[in-house]
Amino acid sequence: MADGLTHITKHGGVQSFIEYTKNTNKLSSDDIQALMLCAMAASYDGVDGISLPVDPHSCDIDEERWSRWMQWDPLTMIEDHRTWPKTFIDVGDKDQYHIQYGLRKLHQKLLDYEIEHTYEEFDGTHSGVEYRMDFSLPWLYTQLTD
């Protein structure tokens, strides 16, 4: 989150950054990463537009906003949704967003709660995973047709 926050702040804040992205001819990789952070903010806590869960200058957590983000975290949600449908989870062991750590915890909770799922950790990152469809789509097909 810190890199995205730095990029957004460089443009003068969320609204200025959004305006910049609307008017630029080409988005950089940093722009895309910052836009993903804005999209999460709008999705997880869109109460008053796009508001980040941290102070833009100190990166201190805004506990109220962060609690709204955490309501969408699978590790939080599983406590209230113990009857999940069968789930396929795969993640690269070198994921650049480091989601493998949270998914390992989710996998363990699913095991603890005896929720049926498939968990696969593969040699790779978050990108270039099209070949993983050869694993997930047959699994999904089987679930839908059984």
Predicted regions and their residues:
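Non-catalytic cap/lid and distal C-terminal segments of serine-dependent acyl enzymes
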Residues: 1-146
